[in-house]
């Protein structure tokens, strides 16, 4: 693996590992799957193929961020609408 690509791959791994802390199934589950995915591709030496894999990893980062934002939005929306609904119905 070429030096610039090596640093990209390491940074991608670190970013994914950091994002995995909030994964719904748990950080351990995410970390194991992440390690397995990286180990599966450890023998890839073609720079073009490595770049494709890095791009795919960056796509996964964007998808995880979208998942987390959506989850936080839903939780916040649920809190506000539960309060509003309970005050309208005088439940509590």
Curated annotation (Swiss-Prot):
InterPro entries the record matches: Complex1_LYR_dom, Complex1_LYR_ETFRF1_LYRM5, ETFRF1
Domain of life where this protein originates: Eukaryota
GO process terms (BP): negative regulation of oxidative phosphorylation; respiratory electron transport chain
Keyword terms: Mitochondrion
Subcellular compartments: Mitochondrion
A GO CC term assigned to this protein in UniProt: mitochondrion
Primary subcellular site in the record, as a coarse category: mitochondrion
Family as reported in the entry's similarity comment: Belongs to the complex I LYR family.
Biological function: Acts as a regulator of the electron transfer flavoprotein by promoting the removal of flavin from the ETF holoenzyme (composed of etfa and etfb).
Protein name (record): Electron transfer flavoprotein regulatory factor 1
Organism: Salmo salar (Atlantic salmon)
Gene coding for it: etfrf1
């Amino acid at each position: 693996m070429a030096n610039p690509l090596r640093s990209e791959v390491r940074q991608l791994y670190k970013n994914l590992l950091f994002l995995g802390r909030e994964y719904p199934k748990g950080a351990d589950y995410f970390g194991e799957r992440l390690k397995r995915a990286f180990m599966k591709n450890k023998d890839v030496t073609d720079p073009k193929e490595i770049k494709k894999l890095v791009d795919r990893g960056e796509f996964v980062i964007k998808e995880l961020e979208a998942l987390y934002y959506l989850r936080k939005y839903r939780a916040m929306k649920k809190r506000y609408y539960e309060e509003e609904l309970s005050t309208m119905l005088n439940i509590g």
